Amino acid sequence: MKLIVSKNFDKKDSYKIDTYIAGGGYEAVKKCLESMKPADIIEEIKKSGLRGRGGAGFPTGMKWSFVPKESSVPKYLAVNADEGEPGTFKDRQILELDPHLLLEGIMIACLAVGIHTAYIYIRGEYKKAFDRIEAAIAECYAKGFLGSDIFGSGYEIDIHAHAGAGAYICGEETGLIESLEGHRGQPRLKPPFPALSGLFAGPTVINNVETLACVPEIISGGAEKFAALGTPKNSGTRLFGVSGDVEKPGVYELELGISARKLIYDICGGVKGGGKLKGFIPGGLSAPIMTADELDTPLDFDSLAKAGSMAGSGGVIVISEHQSIPKIAARTADFYAHESCG
């Protein structure tokens, strides 16, 4: 299987611009500037079948197309890097190990939607990730990849990194917007939806880190190749962050549709210490727990929803026979009461 999002993770100095360029980086955004119209970019993303990797799995190309082509006020892109849900840590890998992949995805999204300003909202505890993103942005400005004339094209894109303050609720898209504007991070009532009136009352696209990191490969390699991975309605790969009672925890890039059994046992070595599996959480702490009898469920958006859980943020938490489900439920309730109520 071809790695898309994690292909540079093991390279020396993977976070530096010269390493990224040497591996073909920024060729996709150049292709967009030289030979693709905004509508062409959106159509390619639609054909790829890319769905949001942050939770709901909404089709990315469709989300981009909701933003008005003409606007009397500036349009914005807000990148949700506020990875605060327990059991979720995949986006941190992209931010720390391949920040330029994210930046190129942001540039392409801006070209597709007619945006000139993007903000990356990074979890407050992710100090190393924030520093890596800031350094990568500075490298892009130094080479003329960002600013008033990107790649000599005459198009202007500015990207800003913004550190949150550790509030989980700011991972909700309108709470994130409120925080970016300098207000208390409290979700807004919808409508209006961000695509029409979001950040600073302008039309706003909000995408997850991993979602945007998929975009350069779709443009450079073609939508068909991306769509050939995964399943017909759940195309591409996904980063799975595996934790809990498991032998080999970590972040793994795999095709959507892989079974929980194959991920937990074949790839991650099974339950820690050879114990028995009691259950697993497939998409971060907010996803309903699944039982050992459901191990053959494909880990994709539609299959997990049909099973009564959700793909969520891709955080797979393994639960052994030694854990108490009532205690896990109580701790989960405590977390959400503290972070989302009052």
Name each model feature, range by range.
Residues 1-48, 115-120, 236, 274-275, ...:
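Iron-sulfur (Fe-S) cluster-binding modules
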Residues 20-26, 80-91, 194-199, 241-246:
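Gly-rich Lys/Arg/Thr-decorated short loops/hinges at beta-loop-alpha junctions or inter-strand turns
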Residues 28-44, 73-75, 81, 90-95, ...:
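Ferredoxin-type iron-sulfur electron-transfer modules in oxidoreductases and energy-metabolism complexes
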Residues 33-75:
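N-terminal glycine-rich phosphate/pyrophosphate-binding loops that anchor nucleotide-derived ligands
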Residues 98-112:
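Histidine-anchored nucleotide/phosphate-binding helix
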Residues 105-109, 256-273:
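Short amphipathic, charge-patterned alpha-helical segments
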Residues 130-256, 268:
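Hydrophobic alpha-helical positions that pack around
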